[in-house]
């Protein structure tokens, strides 16, 4: 386990974990200790002596309480030899007993945690655990996780283990600790549903890298590791060329039935399509998604809805997670920031809202936060640098050019510079530290103009106009471009889409969607651009499609269960309770697959 040398450090304060003493009492007793006055105990460590007061040490450590009060120790005894700890660590322990603070650094954290564990000083243990959580990175996550084998740090262990699972692909590329895993440890990691890999190829390649580190002693473990790969989810070409023909696999008799079963599962999947049984077969069972796409509210059946659905991209399924106590809302904005989903502005067929609600997806609770300065229906919302930006919209009387931003720490909205144009039914995103807003309706016409906001200068700048007028547009940053998708040009709902290059200040067309739509949800999940629901010119829709910039093609995804437009989407990554929002992997009873699916001409599945 390696951390950056003493570049990072913290002084841990823990006034509430052990018995509390007033600051004045602590200061007085510490002065007495340093002066050697009224001390009634000497702690001896490897020849070093530390004067102290028994009462003070007892107040922070049950170890010292037991040591000083046990029947076999004379209460008059003054000198105690303490084994198993260095003088440096004992010095920190004693200072903590008097001051309730301790400096924690990358250089001392392991020894300090071990010492605190030995003396049962839970305040320091917790402080060290919090420090190690903050230091987690690709290089040390395995070492920190293994470190918790020796000490009771369940929260740190969970945090480190989930860091490994969530960052597996990147960790394998750079971590020396990965190569030192035992076969059991590697097997336990790659069999987890929570393992965050977009393609199972990455799991197989990780196995090969691990074996290649010590091929003579590890090649026989291929038979243990290969069944943990979801082989039937691989592209057939990769499976045939890279897995079936691999020398380690071919040389293993135990791998032959695994390969045969994988081929059967791939055939069934190709011929019959996905089925519920795929969730119980370890070769076809989708991993849990790292990020969940939420589709929130909207207009359905002639009125606003409170429906919330969660999209599981790894399983291509929607899960209804509607909170019945939540009120209906349409033409609102949604944003995810620091663990919360924010629902901003909107319309309920009676009122235009300036209110903002915050949803905790772990606790599943809603709370009202500070309202905006203006009522904003058809609002454009985005997140940048820990602020939520809300721009334009319609307040029930006029289309707005005003904009404001919300800071969660202060629970306040602050007005920023107004835009150059009134824009309702526009859409916004962020790219390279700037806010982009495109299209919309100014009260007279649908707009093809776009502008960018610089947070440092608090100024809006007009950029190159789009190729089409677009109100009810979807705008999202994807790769190195700003994408403007669909919308209404004043006559028709659009299938067209275009991408803006900030470097060249130009727009280029991309392939058209399968379906025209305006007032839909848009987000990026697993490196795919998703468009969700909307209005097609005749009716609200529930269909979903996604665009892959690598193939420059659109693909059909699973329909929502509810027809709706005027919804808003946001993506929530790294949920501790992601299983509650994903399609169930055990005893699956989720949504039935569609009877008919329209696919891109070049493929019959979502790209992976």
UniProtKB/Swiss-Prot annotation:
One BP term from GO: homeostasis of number of cells within a tissue
All residue ranges annotated as the BTB domain in the record: 39-106
An example Gene Ontology CC term for this record: Cul3-RING ubiquitin ligase complex
Modified residues (Phosphoserine): 501
UniProt GO molecular function: ubiquitin-like ligase-substrate adaptor activity
InterPro entries attached to this UniProt entry: BACK, Beta-prop_ATRN-MKLN-like, BTB-kelch_protein, BTB/POZ_dom, Kelch-typ_b-propeller, Kelch_1, KLHL10_BTB/POZ, SKP1/BTB/POZ_sf
Alphabetical list of CDD domains matching this protein: BACK_KLHL10 (cd18450), BTB_POZ_KLHL10 (cd18240)
Subcellular location: Cytoplasm
Identification of the protein by name: Kelch-like protein 10
Pfam families noted in UniProt: BACK, Beta-prop_ATRN-LZTR1, BTB, Kelch_1
Quaternary structure note: Self-associates. Interacts with CUL3; indicative for the participation in an E3 ubiquitin ligase complex.
Protein role: May be a substrate-specific adapter of a CUL3-based E3 ubiquitin-protein ligase complex which mediates the ubiquitination and subsequent proteasomal degradation of target proteins during spermatogenesis.
Entry-linked SMART domains: BACK (SM00875), BTB (SM00225), Kelch (SM00612)
Mapped Kelch repeat ranges: 292-339, 340-386, 388-433, 434-480, 481-527, 529-574
Alphabetically ordered keywords of this record: Cytoplasm, Differentiation, Kelch repeat, Phosphoprotein, Repeat, Spermatogenesis, Ubl conjugation pathway
Pathway per the UniProt entry: Protein modification; protein ubiquitination
